[in-house]
Regions:
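Glycan-recognition and catalytic cores of secretory/periplasmic carbohydrate-active enzymes
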Residues: 1-305
């Protein structure tokens, strides 16, 4: 594996984040603790996203620093998370009575991403096997309840936020897990997500391919979640070898470069939404929130692929 070694501010900031956040054992305990309880029942929130986000970033950081203390902390956290997995593979911050609403699948997406990223760096054969099996069982529990057929819920109806694009964004780790563990049901589930169009009542993937609209003209303009769906579509296009969907991602990104890039590097100048930011960045109206950091990071990740 090739590694880049930076100097100056890039290296300093990576090591600062590692020292101050990623080596904070109390923080890891806090984000893992959420899965031993059901805190998101109260408001259908997204407390379950933090473990996976933190794990993904920490694994990427470890690939740069190769810090053994950090690796040990990540190993401890993964083992703790696995104790929260239920008999059927489910890992969630929602109870069974409240599951598959709000941000439940979104949170489970990040659990899956966190497990996949740790699996990539895991040096212990037995733990690596356990982590992969946990990821498989976690996804299997979702596929059992989401999709077509009696007793299943359509993925775009598994959330009342943003026409379900937050749920559809699980496409990325579904495909990534298929690339590690090529089970037919994982690719079929990815097919299902794409065929459903990402959003309830609107096919974001086909709209991007047809290239008639800017993303701020879509009926759903939540920037972070939209881009996350297209990250997944790019992995899907790679696995399926479908130029149609690769072009859809390229056209989507080109439209964003034209209409949403701002001088400070983010996008989405109205709340956390696409709003023709390239133009509106000079506006004088401010609703108290703009240029969500998650949007900036996801934009960087999408372009890096």
């Amino acid at each position: 594996m090739m590694r880049a070694v930076y100097g100056g501010i890039a290296d300093q900031m990576i090591r600062l984040a590692e020292k101050k956040q990623l080596k904070d054992r109390e923080l890891w305990k806090l984000v893992t603790k959420q899965f031993a309880e059901t805190p998101d029942d109260a408001d259908h929130g997204w407390r379950g996203e933090y473990w996976g986000k933190l794990m993904r970033g920490a694994c990427m950081t470890w690939q740069y620093t190769r810090d053994q203390e950090l690796y040990g902390i990540l190993t401890e956290s993964v083992k703790e998370l696995l104790t929260c997995q239920e008999a059927d593979g489910r890992i969630s911050t929602y109870s069974r009575q409240e599951e598959f609403q709000g941000w439940d699948i979104w949170c489970r997406k990040y659990v899956l991403l966190g497990l996949i990223h740790f699996h990539e760096i895991c040096a212990e054969a037995e733990l690596s096997k356990q982590v992969l099996e946990a990821a498989e069982r976690h996804l299997d529990a979702i596929i059992e309840r989401i999709g077509e057929g009696e007793g299943k819920k359509r993925i775009t109806l598994a959330s009342d936020a943003g026409k379900g694009i937050n749920s559809s964004s699980i496409l990325e780790p579904v495909v990534r897990l298929y690339m590690i563990s090529p089970r037919r049901q994982y690719l079929e589930f990815a097919d299902y997500i794409v065929e459903n169009g990402g959003a309830e009542g609107f096919d974001i993937f086909q709209a991007a391919f047809e290239d008639r609209l800017y993303p701020y003209e879509y009926p759903v303009v939540k920037a972070y979640e939209l881009m996350s769906c297209f990250e997944g579509l790019l992995f899907y296009a790679q696995v399926k070898k479908e130029e149609h969907w690769r072009q859809a991602v390229i056209r989507f990104a080109d439209r964003l470069l034209e209409s949403e890039s701002v001088i400070v590097g983010g996008s989405g100048c109205r709340h956390e939404l696409f709003n023709h930011s390239s133009l509106m960045q000079t506006g004088t109206e401010y609703d108290g929130r703009m240029l969500e950091t998650c949007v900036t990071v996801t934009w960087m990740k999408l372009l890096s692929r």
